[in-house]
């Protein structure tokens, strides 16, 4: 259902944000480079002395740099009409860094080269700080445009200047799969999976309805309060876009396609996407053990993390 106004509760009512497939061009998946480098302008680690740093250290540093880029983009957004080239260059740098981050979580695992539904241009976007009960170290920000293909960001003169604000609803099939943790799969480690959906589509993604707050007791307390009317509805997703009228519908449909993929349950033994999420969590926590590493402990992060599901989010 397409609407011309934003839906969902106000305030800190709880949508997590995220990012995914890049827009424009050909297929939905892209080939990765396995390199992970620190951008020249990224802050350097205080204990960096020219030697090689651990992968987790570089990963955290990249995330910090990306968070700063996202904050700058948020401040620059009102000036898009007068600074289109600066805006485009900033988005290209965001794309470059986020692609490196996605590459690190996907290809550095020995023998794993299975693109996830979010693999094409996999982008880390900023999430709302609370993530409805999910831990997040990123500030609350708006979405990030997708890859620098032939779209409105690269063609400032191609837009009519008309901005449309629209929202679609995607139902989550909890009745068909009552034991499947859809919210955990959508959010991913520290909300990164959902950040990528937002980042690649330039849409805002909100998880709403019963079960969208991590703490059931808190959900009951918030039910019926202003801004939390959605808690009386079945679990669902709202996808909001405020974009040039020429691309808004395409971006919404792109986001819906990604979410439909993520909402399709799979057998755990064949779920490469979940394995990527588990490995990413281990990398973020500094507990990753690469195959052949002299360090003690489990070789596979999937066997040692005990992360089954990321449950629901808090308002």
UniProtKB/Swiss-Prot annotation:
Location of the KH domain: 171-238
InterPro entries: BBP-like (IPR045071), KH_1_KHDC4/BBP-like (IPR055256), KH_dom (IPR004087), KH_dom_type_1_sf (IPR036612), STAR_dimer (IPR032377)
Feature: compositional bias, Gly residues: 7-28
Keyword Glycoprotein: no
GO CC terms of this entry: nucleus
Domain of life of the source: Eukaryota
Subcellular localization(s) per the UniProt record: Nucleus
Region span, Disordered: 1-53, 136-158, 289-315
Biased composition (Polar residues): 31-53, 136-146
Keywords, sorted A to Z: Nucleus, Phosphoprotein, RNA-binding
Sites of Phosphoserine modification: 300
Name the UniProt record assigns to this protein: KH domain-containing protein At5g56140
Native source species: Arabidopsis thaliana (Mouse-ear cress)
Phylogenetic lineage: Eukaryota, Viridiplantae, Streptophyta, Embryophyta, Tracheophyta
